[in-house]
């Protein structure tokens, strides 16, 4: 399975489930307007992170209809470059978890580039792809975050808001970990292999370098 390494390390490292809300769908053109994240390990939640972000542009009306974030809500909010150091410290030493992760990672890297910072170097788990592997055979639309939440009895308080979507993503991830353990047994012994030990060390040392400028 594509994420066998996750099942091998999950009892030994921390994870950060995160989500972004944006002004549109193109990372090269649009901007992040909200980040929500929750760091957790096998014992439970460690910390939460949430902030609205001023994007230096108006939010298209069709986007506001989806995430219910308005221009007025972003007045006097920090720009991404003002929160990047805090967010980088928050995710340091963790595996990142996101639903349709390429979207969020592309936006974060685009914002990091605008701030003249290094791109993300963390291991990333895409719960969309993970769900397809753990629960094969569902209809294509059933792998959407809210549909998976409904199927597995996870509570959704505010769909398309970053903080709640991050929490739901975390709960979906832990549901899949538990399902895999029940079906296949825990993978604790695998963590003793040299390869997995090295991976654990790399994860725990992972960070986004916000002290070094790219150009």
Curated annotation (Swiss-Prot):
Free-text cofactor note: Binds 2 divalent metal cations. Magnesium or manganese.
Amino-acid positions noted as binding a divalent metal cation 2 in the UniProt annotation, renumbered to this chain: 19
Keyword entries, A-Z: DNA replication, DNA-directed DNA polymerase, Exonuclease, Hydrolase, Magnesium, Manganese, Metal-binding, Nuclease, Nucleotidyltransferase, Transferase
One GO-annotated biological process of the protein: DNA replication proofreading
Binding site for a divalent metal cation 1: 19, 21, 165
Signal sequence coordinates: none
Residues annotated to bind substrate: 19, 21, 62, 67, 165
GO CC annotation, single: cytosol
General function of this protein: DNA polymerase III is a complex, multichain enzyme responsible for most of the replicative synthesis in bacteria. The epsilon subunit contain the editing function and is a proofreading 3'-5' exonuclease.
Protein name: DNA polymerase III subunit epsilon
Active site: 160
MF terms in GO: 3'-5' exonuclease activity; DNA binding; DNA-directed DNA polymerase activity; metal ion binding
EC number: 2.7.7.7
Cofactor: Mg(2+); Mn(2+)
Segments forming a coiled coil: none
Catalysis performed (reactions): DNA(n) + a 2'-deoxyribonucleoside 5'-triphosphate = DNA(n+1) + diphosphate
Originating organism: Treponema pallidum (strain Nichols)
